[in-house]
Amino acid sequence: MDNREKSRLLWKCRRGMLELDLVLQKFIANEIDRLTENQLKAFDNLLTHNDPNLYAWLMGHEEPEKELLEIVSFIRNCD
């Protein structure tokens, strides 16, 4: 992944909720270089969803769509 793409994903991690900012920015800072191409695509797709859904999925209050389940589980388990 080139620096431009990394910068784009880092920018997309900046959300309107502090809680999401903390989780997403920590995740991407620690894991970006280890994610597979499919995981990067799933993460990029995840970031297209609205903050209330992201928060509910990442906090385990609701289950995400099937195609996002793997990346959401991965983010939940990264600490």
UniProtKB/Swiss-Prot annotation:
<dbReference type="InterPro" id="IPR036714">
    <property type="entry name" value="SDH_sf"/>
</dbReference>
<dbReference type="GO" id="GO:0006105">
    <property type="term" value="P:succinate metabolic process"/>
</dbReference>
<comment type="similarity">
    <text>Belongs to the SdhE FAD assembly factor family.</text>
</comment>
<dbReference type="Pfam" id="PF03937">
    <property type="entry name" value="Sdh5"/>
</dbReference>
<keyword id="KW-0143">Chaperone</keyword>
<protein>
    <recommendedName>
        <fullName>FAD assembly factor SdhE</fullName>
    </recommendedName>
</protein>
<comment type="function">
    <text>An FAD assembly protein, which accelerates covalent attachment of the cofactor into other proteins. Plays an essential role in the assembly of succinate dehydrogenase (SDH, respiratory complex II), an enzyme complex that is a component of both the tricarboxylic acid cycle and the electron transport chain, and which couples the oxidation of succinate to fumarate with the reduction of ubiquinone (coenzyme Q) to ubiquinol. Required for flavinylation (covalent attachment of FAD) of the flavoprotein subunit SdhA of SDH and other flavinylated proteins as well.</text>
</comment>
<dbReference type="GO" id="GO:0005737">
    <property type="term" value="C:cytoplasm"/>
</dbReference>
<dbReference type="InterPro" id="IPR050531">
    <property type="entry name" value="SdhE_FAD_assembly_factor"/>
</dbReference>
<dbReference type="InterPro" id="IPR005631">
    <property type="entry name" value="SDH"/>
</dbReference>
<keyword id="KW-0963">Cytoplasm</keyword>
